[in-house]
UniProtKB/Swiss-Prot annotation:
Keywords: Cytoplasm, DNA-binding, Transcription, Transcription regulation
Claim: DNA-binding is one of the keywords in the record: yes
InterPro entries (UniProt xref): Integrase-like_N (IPR017856), TACO1_YebC-like_2nd/3rd_dom (IPR048300), TACO1_YebC_N (IPR049083), Transcrip_reg_TACO1-like (IPR002876), Transcrip_reg_TACO1-like_dom3 (IPR026564), YebC-like (IPR029072)
Protein name as catalogued: Probable transcriptional regulatory protein Noc_0137
Family matches, as Pfam families: TACO1_YebC_N, Transcrip_reg
A cellular-component GO term for this protein: cytosol
């Protein structure tokens, strides 16, 4: 099965943007704190916390920061009580967008989200207005240099739902959320190191964009991601490899 890389289409420059804004640690700390609050402070029994910790280590977050975030979540240390909230709507060109936030003030957050949607010609919708276009999936991604046969064999045996080879020869392993940790562990133990791995939202349909449309869409997504309360932005925009190359 071939396709456009999920990471290329949704997050191809997200890492660089996070680093530039200095927001990555803040997002990871909030995710660790909320995961620990909801599922407890033991990563062995909390797949969400385990994933958040893995991402924090990959970002070179100091161990002390991770431990403090866990303790804030479990209540062993005082901290801000964040709640999770999701906003949905349509961005430019009819692209469906979901925005996951962690906030201590819903009124502030929704006002900021609505302002960005309006500024870029989009419309913030009601709960469920675009969620039906997305499904929660575990996605484990590998570079084009990876061993496709080995990944496919281990992933399928480990319980993966699908293995997709993209147009650029990168590989995405899809899992149901509850199977994500098991599949990732099997791949890790087989020595197959992933470039990216997380439970995310995968669009069932996509909207193809021309060059200038793609440029505007990416600026819109960046504007959302720059908001302090935003943790993650999902869209069903589809940028071709050619468009990504031109955007640089």
């Amino acid at each position: 099965m071939a396709g456009h890389s999920k990471w290329a289409n949704i997050q191809y420059r997200k890492g660089a943007q996070d680093a530039k804004r200095g927001k990555l640690f803040t997002r990871l700390i909030r995710e660790i704190t909320v995961a620990a609050r909801l599922e407890g402070g033991d990563p062995a029994t909390s797949p969400r916390l385990r994933t958040a910790i893995d991402k924090a280590f990959a970002a070179n977050m100091p161990k002390d920061n991770i431990e403090r975030a866990i303790k804030r979540g479990t209540g062993d240390l005082e901290g801000v009580a964040y709640e999770e909230v999701r906003y949905e709507g349509y961005g430019p060109y009819g692209v469906a967008v979901m925005v996951d936030c962690m906030t201590d003030n819903r009124n502030r957050t929704v006002a900021e989200i609505r302002h960005v949607f309006s500024k870029w010609g989009g419309n913030l919708g009601t709960d469920g207005s675009v969620a039906y276009l997305f499904s929660k999936k575990g996605i484990i991604s590998y570079s084009k240099e990876s061993n496709e046969d080995a990944i496919m064999e281990v992933a399928i045996e480990g319980g993966a739902e699908d293995v997709v080879t993209n147009e650029d020869s990168s590989i995405d392993v899809f899992t149901e959320p509850e199977e994500f940790s098991t599949v990732k562990k099997a791949l890790d133990e087989a020595g197959l190191k992933a470039e990216q791995a997380e439970i995310t939202q995968h669009a069932s349909t996509s909207v193809s964009l021309a060059l200038e449309e793609a440029r505007k869409m990416l600026d819109f997504l960046d504007a959302l991601e720059e908001l302090d309360d935003v943790q993650q932005v999902y869209s069903n925009a589809d940028f071709s490899e050619e468009i990504l190359a031109q955007l640089g």
